[in-house]
Amino acid sequence: MAIVKCKPTSPGRRFVVKVVNQELHKGAPHAPLLEKKSKTGGRNNNGRITTRHIGGGHKQHYRLVDFRRNDKDGISATVERIEYDPNRTAHIALLLYADGERRYIIAPKGVSAGDQLIAGALAPIKPGNALQLRNIPVGSTVHGIELKPGKGAQIARSAGASAQLIAREGVYVTLRLRSGEMRKVLAECRATLGEVSNSEHSLRSLGKAGAKRWRGVRPTVRGVAMNPVDHPHGGGEGRTSGGRHPVSPWGFPTKGAKTRGNKRTDKMIVRRRK
């Protein structure tokens, strides 16, 4: 991968920083693994805004990514190509299994076209192979981690993400996440070895507001710039600071307020994130 800074030929190009990967497939995606993706504009079935800052953007297809990797145990697969996916920050890899089926997976870092991958208890310890956490050596770096056996990967799926397996005790293993959190996960859950590809994603700069609009993201308006009817920070004569601690448009504390409410899984957290 290469980090490319654009020359300031226009105001919109001045701050553009691109991450260029020459290995990415330049053709169309694999059609049988595409699904229609409808735009909602952030509205529900009543037409009311349920998620702010969503609207517009380029038309996209959803790529069907295999997050489970549990029904092809022992069947080797060849990486046909690495592709761009507009629906996520990570790249995806198209696998051709020995039985003739093709599937997309999250592309692990260091995996390229022509590599052989396999899933299952007997899979060798190398990046891209998927197996149960109880079969992975302590100290290994993993991604695409399940929280419930068979449910599919839920942890460490975005660009550059990973976790480290630091202990194994009984039916649980302990993972250290990138956030600093340490948590227990059932040893029967699956994970993929290595870290997620496209770790340079955070180094890019879109350069202009329009590039954000191409991605379907609308502007975020500050509460202090609104009227009192629209936001608790709105109104006032001239410019104000809002007059109170930061809150959301509905009056809930924001900017640092704890939002985690899943007490059921608190017992699985060994150490809270930093």
Curated annotation (Swiss-Prot):
Pfam families on file: Ribosomal_L2 (PF00181), Ribosomal_L2_C (PF03947)
Keywords assigned by UniProt, alphabetized: Ribonucleoprotein, Ribosomal protein, RNA-binding, rRNA-binding
GO terms for cellular component: large ribosomal subunit
UniProt entry tagged with the keyword Ribosomal protein: yes
One of the protein's GO biological processes: cytoplasmic translation
Gene3D superfamilies: 2.30.30.30, Nucleic acid-binding proteins, Ribosomal protein L2, domain 3
Listed InterPro entries: NA-bd_OB-fold, Rib_uL2_dom2, Ribosomal_uL2, Ribosomal_uL2_bac/org-type, Ribosomal_uL2_C, Ribosomal_uL2_CS, Ribosomal_uL2_dom3, Ribosomal_uL2_RNA-bd_dom
Residue ranges, annotated region (Disordered): 28-54, 224-274
Chain intervals with Basic and acidic residues compositional bias: 263-274
Gene Ontology terms for molecular function: rRNA binding; structural constituent of ribosome; transferase activity
S-adenosyl-L-methionine recorded as keyword: no
Described function: One of the primary rRNA binding proteins. Required for association of the 30S and 50S subunits to form the 70S ribosome, for tRNA binding and peptide bond formation. It has been suggested to have peptidyltransferase activity; this is somewhat controversial. Makes several contacts with the 16S rRNA in the 70S ribosome.
Record PANTHER family: LARGE RIBOSOMAL SUBUNIT PROTEIN UL2M, RIBOSOMAL PROTEIN L2
Family label: Belongs to the universal ribosomal protein uL2 family.
HAMAP family in alphabetical order: Ribosomal_uL2_B
Complex and partners: Part of the 50S ribosomal subunit. Forms a bridge to the 30S subunit in the 70S ribosome.
The name this protein goes by in its record: Large ribosomal subunit protein uL2
Gene giving rise to this polypeptide: rplB
